[in-house]
């Protein structure tokens, strides 16, 4: 079955809508402009735009999470943003359920949804169909774990579930606590409880990247812009409303500003510290996407599974014609058959010409 293009826009027959239009994922490390490119593509395709950033699901955490601004959200509906209060622990299983339901709804309407974000586990929960442990939050256990220093919690996670710890930043208190909850509740590492059930619809994963020196410059510019927009005031307000021990306030950027407000970091050191730690986080994201999503350097990579195909490739986030590069890949992917007889090895290197 091939998808026809009408004026460059895919048109699926009603009988095919449960198998096609599939899913487009725009992923990559922080500060690569994923949200902007996803917005442009969503407007061009008429697609639902779904957030896959684990902090943007929370209300009130706006500036420090690089959440699309109200003006940007007014240009096109952004979904799975601002859906829970900061005091609620939103699990990967909850995200997966919400995302899968919205994707299924989009497919019934003949639409190709776009999933955008940098939280690898959120993305993998959808693209690989991970079986996420259904472990509800444990308030009493969490209160006990929150009394431990963050570095002790993370070190303990490294002992109990080293695989999960590899993919969690040492300063990510939310995910560290969640992984420990699962270990203590089930007696097994969270990483050992996940079983993949890949979806049968086609998936296109577009990873945005640039060399680390340029990415660090982008991180520095964005951090300065966040400060100018009132990030410190945002943190002050959140600390007054929820208290300084809120787990989300221990995450990247918010924790450093909290330390500054408490007099533990000089003002002159605050912004460089956030930039340095964000760069470290971006390197971990790159490692994760290369290893877990199969996005390889410099070429397209295809894997075939059942009725569906997952294709992933990197694009330079600073390319002047990036929107057109993305559009070229989307059109080629949509025009390709949804079933093929060749092996993954045979498919590699010839699915696209990036």
Curated annotation (Swiss-Prot):
Q: Which GO terms describe its biological process?
A: tRNA modification
Keywords attached to this Swiss-Prot or TrEMBL record, sorted alphabetically, are: ATP-binding, Magnesium, Nucleotide-binding, Transferase, tRNA processing
Which GO terms of the molecular function aspect are on file? ATP binding; tRNA dimethylallyltransferase activity
The record lists ATP as bound by 28-35
Report residues binding substrate: 30-35
Q: Where is this site: Interaction with substrate tRNA?
A: 119
Task: Cite a single Pfam family from the UniProt record.
Answer: IPPT
> InterPro entries attached here?
Dimethylallyltransferase, IPT, P-loop_NTPase
Q: Where is this region: Interaction with substrate tRNA?
A: 53-56
Q: What is its EC number?
A: 2.5.1.75
Reported cofactor(s) = Mg(2+)
Claim: Iron-sulfur is one of the keywords in the record: no
Q: Does the entry feature the keyword Glycoprotein, yes or no? A: no
Q: Which reaction does it catalyse?
A: adenosine(37) in tRNA + dimethylallyl diphosphate = N(6)-dimethylallyladenosine(37) in tRNA + diphosphate
Signal peptide range equals: none
Q: Which domain of life is it from?
A: Bacteria
Report the family membership: Belongs to the IPP transferase family.
- Known role: Catalyzes the transfer of a dimethylallyl group onto the adenine at position 37 in tRNAs that read codons beginning with uridine, leading to the formation of N6-(dimethylallyl)adenosine (i(6)A).
Quaternary structure, from the entry: Monomer.
Name of this chain's protein: tRNA dimethylallyltransferase
């Amino acid at each position: 079955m091939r998808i026809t293009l009408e004026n460059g826009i895919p048109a699926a027959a009603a009988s095919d809508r449960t198998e096609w239009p599939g899913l487009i994922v725009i992923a990559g490390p922080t500060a690569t402009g994923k949200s902007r490119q996803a917005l442009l593509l969503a407007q061009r395709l008429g697609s639902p735009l779904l957030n896959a950033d684990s902090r943007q699901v929370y209300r009130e955490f706006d500036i420090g999470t690089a959440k699309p601004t109200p003006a940007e959200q007014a240009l096109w509906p952004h979904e799975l943003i601002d859906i829970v209060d900061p005091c609620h622990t939103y699990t990967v299983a909850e995200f997966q359920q919400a995302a899968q339901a919205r994707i299924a709804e989009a497919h019934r309407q003949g639409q190709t949804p776009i999933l955008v974000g940098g939280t690898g586990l959120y993305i993998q929960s959808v693209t690989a169909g991970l079986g996420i442990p259904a472990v509800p939050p444990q308030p009493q256990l969490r209160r006990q774990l929150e009394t431990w220093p963050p570095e002790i919690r993370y070190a303990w996670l490294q002992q109990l579930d080293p695989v999960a710890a590899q993919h969690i930043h040492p300063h990510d208190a939310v995910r560290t606590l969640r992984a420990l909850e699962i270990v203590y509740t089930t007696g097994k590492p969270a990483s050992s409880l996940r079983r993949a059930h890949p979806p049968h619809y086609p998936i296109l994963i577009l990873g945005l990247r640039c060399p680390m020196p340029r990415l660090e410059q982008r991180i520095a510019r964005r951090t300065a812009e966040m400060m100018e927009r009132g990030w410190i005031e945002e943190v002050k307000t959140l600390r007054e409303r929820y208290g300084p021990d809120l787990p989300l306030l221990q995450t990247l950027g918010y924790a450093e500003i909290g330390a500054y407000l408490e007099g533990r970091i000089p003002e002159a050191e605050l912004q460089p510290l956030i930039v340095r730690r964000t760069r470290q986080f971006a390197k971990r994201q790159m490692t994760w996407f290369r290893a877990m999503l199969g996005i390889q350097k410099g070429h397209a990579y295809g894997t075939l599974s059942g009725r569906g195909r997952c294709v992933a490739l990197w694009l330079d986030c600073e390319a002047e014609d990036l929107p057109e590069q993305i559009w070229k890949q989307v059109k080629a992917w949509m025009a390709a058959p949804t079933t093929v007889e060749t092996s993954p090895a045979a498919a590699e290197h010839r699915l696209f010409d990036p």
